[in-house]
Amino acid sequence: MSELAIEASGLVKVFGENRAVDGIDLKVPAGTVYGVLGPNGAGKTTAVKMLATLLRPNGGEARIFGKDVVREADAVRSMVSLTGQYASVDEDLTGTENLVLIGRLTGHRKPAARARAEELLAAFGLTEAAGRQVKNYSGGMRRRIDIAASILNTPDVLFLDEPTTGLDPRSRNQVWDIVRAIVRHGTTVLLTTQYLDEADQLASRIAVIDRGKVIAEGTKGQLKASVGAGAVHVRLREADQRSEAEALLVRTLQAQVVLESDPVALTARLSGESTEQGAAEHASHALGELARAGIIVDTFSLGQPSLDEVFLALTDRTATPEESAA
Amino acid sequence: MSTTAVKENEPVLAAPKPEDLAAVLIAKNRPQRPSALSTSVTFGWRAMLKIKHVPEQLFDVTAFPIMMTLMFTYLFGGALSGSPTEYLQFLLPGIMASSILMITMYTGISVNTDIEKGVFDRFRTLPIWRPSAMVGYLLGDMLRYLIASVVILGVGLIMGFRPGGGVGGVAAAILLLLAFSFAFSWIWTMFGLLLRSEKSVMGVSMMVLFPLTFLSNIYVDPKTMPGWLQAFVDVNPVTHVVAAVRSMMSGDWDGGEITWVLIAGGVILAIFGTLTMRLYNRK
């Protein structure tokens, strides 16, 4: 295995009664994007804050390129950068001022800090907004200035805490492109997200966390296979054809079919073995079968597994052994 | 101006180009870790920029001191010294000290509101001398205190204040006052970090500052007070600050009081500076 950029074992953080992070292990190989996927309140931000030396763990330990985040915090700080979930830039200052500030604080002399700020603003497409206060920036621009501030001193490890939450799709794609460029350069990125497709697009390995614990970890392929290929959503014209459609879908897809509260809607969850292409093939076959049987379909769609579905699948699986044991 | 602002708000920004990004990412030599002085001054520069962007925040160091000076001179002047001008010679150094000490509490309030913002997370992940963010704050506040001092002095001179110590004495007195205020402000940075809301910071500050400034030698000669009150006034640091400042402005430097103020400042800084940094590191 290649060198580890981030290594955490048994990391714990307790706030009062709440075990926000409850024994997390992570191994992130250098030069990769690692996705930490989980819903709000799962402990993602708390975990990132401990790794970035902002919070002191109550238990366990973590190292960044071999340096302990508590005992060698200063050495860790010279290697990492953090783009927090909420803008980690000063909203009262302009784009240029923010970058010059960080440049000065990382030891650049004034002319060098100015030059670096201009260069970064240009590369991030923010030259026109350079003289405006960040509070007047759009969400996408804020993210960009934030990431620009984070890479000003070319960190070895970059933490991105929900970098695209609240962004429109175009800005989101731009942030993704930025992340890809950063990784190509050799920086290791740890990214937290609530969106499976974001982790899918960017990360090579993913850890799914829930209630402070890692509930699944692996490459994208492994994780997807364990979760399922997605779901086929069908809406019929006639409600009385639904039971017939259900039977047909169960037969052709060999899938679990759920009847929605809407009397004309039903959803089939595709099993995990099929690849994505297989899922599409299966779905179109099922559509053909429905037509042949004379069932009128109004809408038909193939959805990627959503985070909800990932969760359902993963938590179901962890719940099952306990039930069978009881 | 407004039309360009509207145009700029339209999100027609060019997407970042991968080759440009690659260019800025090419490993630059990381510069040497900056010195404690350099980072403190940089944070001071940040405070100045904030004043530049929101100049209204100077209201508390301009209008408030003018109001204090006018109010107390004309309110008490006739009764206590026969005439406002007469009283002003006694009051001005004191009202200056009390106004500056009063506005030090805004330091705590701004620390309290600022620390919750994400930008502090970034500062705290930088490999820099830890107290520099706080020191920078106070450097910015020193400018505010200086503005307030000059405003009060200006109003005083217009109203007939004639300091015997001349330019040198007055300048030295203001310097001593600023140095003490720098140390004194760490009390508020501590409360700013300790308390949960800016309202509670305000409440605590008022509760400390009102007795400290009023139960002192600022407005009247302590000899007229009952013994138990004199005892408090005598140990009140504000009394010593005012005595020192008064002596310097009148040209009759009181070495004992000046030394007392410098030592008290050092002690306050050592205690509250340490407490502030403890809280800052734990936050």
Model-derived features with residue positions:
Chain B
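Alpha-helical transmembrane segments of multi-pass membrane transporters/translocases
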Residues: 3-9, 15-21, 26-27, 69-73, ...
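Aromatic- and glycine-rich beta-strand/loop motifs that create alpha-glucan
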Residues: 16-17, 22-64
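Membrane-interfacial helix-loop-helix junctions in multi-pass membrane proteins
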Residues: 50, 82, 162, 213-270
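Short, hydrophobic transmembrane alpha-helix segments
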Residues: 55, 74-84, 212
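Pore- or pathway-lining transmembrane helices of multi-pass membrane proteins that form conduits
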Residues: 59-64, 196-217
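Hydrophobic alpha-helical transmembrane segments of multi-pass membrane transport proteins
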Residues: 67-72, 88-159, 180, 184, ...
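Short helix-capping/hinge motifs at transmembrane helix termini and TM-loop junctions
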Residues: 72-81, 159-164, 168, 195-197, ...
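Alpha-helical transmembrane segments and their short interhelical loops
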Residues: 130-205, 252-279
